[in-house]
């Protein structure tokens, strides 16, 4: 009898440019492949045995001739290359119109409404920036004036950074809730609270980041699961991405190691339902910072942690490992990249095989839906291929 399905999203671990990547400025991007070559090879014995070497050319991870899992890759059908778009498509919501971006900063009507309705003394920044860089550039002025640092990226995001000694965490969250309401008509995917700590020149972001997402514009597979009485545990930023819709339990995490440990612990007590996990460090700490060595270490950390999760799965359980977009740390850009994403599916006792290139991330959601016996409107399930 079907019991549990685990989805691990290695945030940003793309595996090669999509055909339209050049239109996004991402020709040649291959987060996994380019990272492996930048560091002289990766040591990923578990992922390699599962078939990761089949999805793109990864130095140190050759294609295993007898993989233990089913392997393939997925292409994004929606416009965009961001976290929200990728996760929504995985759960059956394909965006025909891309979410709005602000390459020139936010217009006065947005900024003025934010200042007026939050009571903030003004804002600093209002530009496209790397979050780790802008807090070093403006952090001292922020602490002196109390003005939050507002910035965006190539993605549809309104980010608000504040030092926790200057703006209490709950105040920052309240400001972001206000921004979320202001920005709904503008089709901005996420408002992100970016708390940081430290002293001038040594500022560092914390894991108390919080995302305030635009609600999905259509019913997701997650919502259908909950309507059918299927438990859905969101680990990491999953609840934020879906505006807490279709989630029955939330697990906050402090990075990849914590998220992986909590996932293993969940499998000791959860005997039915979906466990949906986002592992954010790949993207937040290494992809956006163009740090291939750190990215490689995080991949190897994931590889070492996987056995504790795989060993807790029994007959009828499934585990799918994928990503939501790319963020190639070897390219000049510090933004996300428009890439295929890997798809590894472990079905205990079933061996492995080739799932090919799926034409939409929604194939994963269709598979989840079929596994639990609910309806899906988008995508083609591969459940029969991994359970035959």
UniProtKB/Swiss-Prot annotation:
InterPro entries: Alkaline_phosphatase_core_sf, DeoB, Metalloenzyme, Phosphopentomutase_DeoB_cap_sf. Its EC number is 5.4.2.7. The keyword Signal does not apply. Mn(2+) 2 binds at residues 283, 288, 336. Binds 2 manganese ions. It is an enzyme of class 5 (isomerase). Keywords: Cytoplasm, Isomerase, Manganese, Metal-binding. It catalyses: 2-deoxy-alpha-D-ribose 1-phosphate = 2-deoxy-D-ribose 5-phosphate; alpha-D-ribose 1-phosphate = D-ribose 5-phosphate. One of its GO terms (molecular function) is magnesium ion binding. Pathway: Carbohydrate degradation; 2-deoxy-D-ribose 1-phosphate degradation; D-glyceraldehyde 3-phosphate and acetaldehyde from 2-deoxy-alpha-D-ribose 1-phosphate: step 1/2. Belongs to the phosphopentomutase family. Isomerase that catalyzes the conversion of deoxy-ribose 1-phosphate (dRib-1-P) and ribose 1-phosphate (Rib-1-P) to deoxy-ribose 5-phosphate (dRib-5-P) and ribose 5-phosphate (Rib-5-P), respectively. This is Phosphopentomutase. It comes from Anaeromyxobacter dehalogenans (strain 2CP-1 / ATCC BAA-258).
């Amino acid at each position: 009898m079907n019991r549990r399905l685990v989805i691990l999203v290695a945030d940003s671990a793309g595996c090669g440019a999509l055909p339209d990547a050049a239109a996004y400025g991402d020709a040649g991007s291959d987060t996994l492949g380019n990272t492996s070559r930048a560091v002289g090879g990766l040591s990923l014995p578990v992922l390699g045995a599962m078939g990761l070497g089949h999805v793109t050319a990864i130095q140190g991870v050759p294609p295993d001739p007898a993989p233990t899992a089913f392997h393939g890759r997925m292409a994004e059908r929606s416009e965009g290359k961001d976290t929200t778009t990728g996760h929504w498509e995985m759960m059956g919501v394909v965006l025909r119109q891309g979410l709005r971006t602000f390459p020139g900063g936010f217009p006065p009507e947005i900024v003025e409404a934010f200042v007026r309705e939050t009571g903030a003394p003004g804002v600093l920044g209002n530009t496209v920036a790397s979050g780790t860089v802008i807090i070093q550039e403006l952090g001292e002025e922020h602490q002196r004036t109390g003005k939050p640092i507002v910035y965006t990226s190539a993605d549809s995001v309104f980010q608000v950074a504040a030092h926790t000694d200057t703006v209490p965490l709950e105040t920052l969250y309240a400001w972001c809730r206000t921004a979320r309401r202001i920005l709904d008509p503008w089709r901005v995917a996420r408002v992100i609270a970016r708390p940081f700590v430290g002293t001038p020149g040594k500022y560092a972001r914390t894991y108390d980041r919080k995302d305030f997402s635009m609600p999905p514009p259509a019913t997701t597979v997650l919502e259908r699961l909950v309507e059918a009485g299927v438990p859905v545990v969101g680990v990491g930023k999953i609840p934020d991405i879906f505006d807490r819709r279709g989630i029955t339990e939330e697990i906050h995490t402090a990075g990849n190691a914590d998220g992986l440990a909590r996932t293993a612990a969940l499998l000791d007590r959860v005997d039915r339902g979906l466990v949906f996990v986002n592992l954010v460090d790949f993207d937040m700490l290494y992809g956006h910072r163009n740090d291939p060595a750190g990215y490689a270490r995080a991949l190897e950390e994931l590889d070492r942690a996987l056995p504790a999760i795989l060993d807790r799965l029994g007959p009828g359980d499934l585990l799918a490992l994928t990503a939501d977009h790319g963020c190639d740390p070897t390219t000049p850009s510090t933004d996300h990249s428009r890439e295929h994403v890997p798809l590894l599916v472990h079905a205990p006792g079933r061996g492995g095989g080739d799932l090919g290139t799926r034409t939409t991330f929604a194939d994963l959601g269709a598979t989840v839906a079929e596994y639990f016996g609910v309806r899906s409107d988008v995508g083609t399930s591969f459940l029969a291929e991994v359970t035959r």
